[in-house]
């Protein structure tokens, strides 16, 4: 029985084809050529199309921050809500995200804290595609030239792609401001998620191929906490396409 779905989108969302890495199964949906350049109607239309593929899932982990608006009233949706509400409280926040996240001011779902939004599609694309840190630095330098970070207590990475480069962002911003917290939507998910060991973890993922490193990090995260033993593999069940 499939009991968990992880929903994510990115540069791509069409075909649901499979990529195998690190003992995990990936389902890559390749529709949008560039991340963050689509509107709410396009996002909702695509989710509705995909939803039938994971309609039997008992829980849907929503890693795509732009999809939260669609899933926020679903009893099956999980996106680290409790952790986000706790960690975003009483802080002046700079939110780095997609154009849609900025337009909808998505963080208002989780906090009354003052939030400034910055649309960073080039950073999200770079993070998703795993570009080198020196290229990420060049992009950041362009975005944040003459930027005053002194009024912020937190920089929120509103993208699972940006989360992949979290260590880079910690180092980058540490050189520009003495003390600032870096937190992402994926941090909230990892903080709230309760891992239950089974012989096989019957999960399946809707992700972009370039985000495969996240699942390696998720596996490392579980090992460090003793939830996944040294020689135990984090496996996912196969999802077969029907009528596609």
Task: Annotate each language-model stretch with its function.
Residues 1-244:
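Non-catalytic structural scaffold of enzyme domains
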């Amino acid at each position: 029985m499939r009991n968990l779905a992880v929903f994510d989108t990115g540069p791509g969302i069409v075909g649901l084809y499979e990529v195998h890495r690190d003992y995990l199964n990936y389902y890559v949906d390749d529709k949008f050529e560039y991340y963050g350049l689509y509107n709410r109607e396009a996002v909702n239309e695509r989710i509705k199309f995909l939803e039938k593929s994971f309609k039997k899932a008992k829980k849907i982990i929503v890693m795509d921050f732009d999809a939260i608006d669609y899933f926020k009233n679903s009893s099956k949706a999980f996106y680290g809500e409790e952790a986000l509400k706790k960690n975003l409280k009483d802080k002046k926040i700079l939110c780095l995200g997609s154009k849609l996240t900025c337009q909808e001011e998505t963080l208002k779902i989780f906090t009354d804290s003052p939030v400034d939004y910055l649309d960073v599609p080039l950073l999200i694309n770079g993070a998703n595609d795993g570009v080198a840190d020196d290229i990420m630095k060049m992009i950041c330098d362009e975005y944040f030239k003459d930027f005053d970070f002194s009024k912020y207590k937190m920089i929120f990475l509103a993208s699972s792609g940006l989360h992949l480069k979290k260590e880079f962002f910690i180092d980058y911003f540490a050189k520009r401001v003495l003390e600032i917290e870096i937190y992402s939507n994926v941090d909230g998910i990892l903080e709230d998620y309760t891992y239950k060991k089974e012989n096989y973890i019957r999960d399946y993922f809707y992700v972009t191929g370039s985000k495969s490193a996240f699942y390696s990090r998720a596996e490392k995260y579980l090992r460090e906490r003793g939830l996944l033993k040294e020689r135990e593999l984090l496996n996912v069940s196969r999802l077969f396409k029907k009528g596609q």
